[in-house]
């Protein structure tokens, strides 16, 4: 690709998640596809963090204010990694300026912010994408391809276990990953029921789902279970697939058919994290959409129902 067709990108927010989930994949993509992208700016309210991203990952300019960045730089896309209470307003700013953007889940800190962002995204017509890396995990997608060839999925299940995560927003800020991934696998949710278990230091959740496709499923959300693991199970007549990713002692996938283990694949210890957890593949998908002028996926409209389910559970828990 020649320099005239280079995609110019900015990153807003330079914290830990921005680094592991976005800066590292962007730098990898640039190194593997010279001249295809330009990392024109990094922005953070703490200017020293933006400057560090410039030094470490090759961003050209550093800013402490998004308005200054947008007034000085010409960009083709922006990745915004900001706290939940800033996601909606930052996303709306970019959408209204018709800058194709990636925003983070959970799209807002309250349901009204999520709904406003979704409305503005539809009204603006600006290409947009939500960072939900599970949809891009190679192990999950290879397992889905295998299951599709094996037969029809009848049941899906996720166990999302964490250690010492007692924050009240866990159900909508983190567990939304599980809901969104099952929607990615099985389609739109027709109805759901949630049982909240209040014993211990944090609420645990058992969420039963019926999908419009007829598939049934369940999510067990265990934020203080003393371990960090995320496992997805896909079951059909005569077959079962298990995917452990992005967290677990041993990450990969296994498939059983007619009582026998037929396929297994595990991540080698030296495999870079962003290649395992889908962050690199997500980054590549956004860049590809900008390059091809196609519609990025998943969009705000695609992911908003996942957030709405989780926030409705949280609101019911506190009696709203």
Spans of model-derived segments:
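C-terminal helix-rich "cap/oligomerization" subdomain common to oxidoreductases
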Residues: 1-6, 77-82, 126, 285-320
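Mid-domain beta-loop-alpha active-site segment that forms a flexible
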Residues: 131-138, 160-192, 302-303
């Amino acid at each position: 690709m020649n320099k005239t067709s280079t995609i110019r990108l900015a990153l807003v927010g330079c914290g830990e998640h921005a680094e592991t989930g976005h800066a590292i994949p962007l730098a990898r993509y640039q190194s593997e596809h010279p001249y295809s992208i330009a990392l024109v700016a990094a922005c953070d309210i703490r200017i020293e963090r933006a400057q560090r991203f410039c030094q470490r990952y090759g961003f050209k300019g550093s800013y402490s204010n998004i308005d200054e960045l947008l007034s000085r730089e010409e960009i083709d896309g922006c990745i915004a990694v900001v706290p939940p209470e800033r996601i909606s307003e930052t996303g709306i700013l970019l959408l209204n300026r018709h800058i194709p953007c990636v925003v983070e889940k959970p799209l807002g800190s309250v349901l009204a912010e999520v709904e406003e962002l979704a409305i503005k995204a539809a009204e603006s017509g600006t290409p947009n994408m939500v960072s939900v890396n599970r949809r891009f995990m190679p192990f999950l997608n290879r397992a889905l391809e295998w299951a599709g060839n094996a037969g029809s999925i009848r049941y899906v299940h996720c166990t999302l276990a964490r250690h010492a995560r007692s924050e009240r927003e866990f159900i909508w800020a983190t567990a939304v990953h599980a809901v969104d991934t099952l929607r990615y696998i099985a389609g739109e949710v027709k109805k759901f029921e949630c049982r909240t278990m209040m014993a211990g230091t944090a609420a645990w959740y058992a969420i039963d789902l019926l999908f419009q496709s007829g598939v049934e499923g369940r999510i067990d959300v265990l934020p203080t279970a003393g371990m960090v693991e995320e496992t997805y199970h896909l079951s059909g007549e005569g077959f079962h697939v298990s995917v452990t990713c992005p967290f677990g002692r041993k990450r990969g996938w296994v498939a059983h058919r007619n009582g026998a283990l037929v396929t297994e694949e595990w991540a080698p210890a030296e495999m870079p994290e962003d290649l395992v957890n889908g962050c690199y593949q997500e980054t590549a998908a956004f860049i590809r959409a900008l390059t091809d002028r196609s519609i990025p996926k998943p969009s705000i409209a695609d992911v908003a129902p996942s957030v709405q389910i989780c926030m409705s559970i949280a609101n019911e828990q506190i009696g709203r």
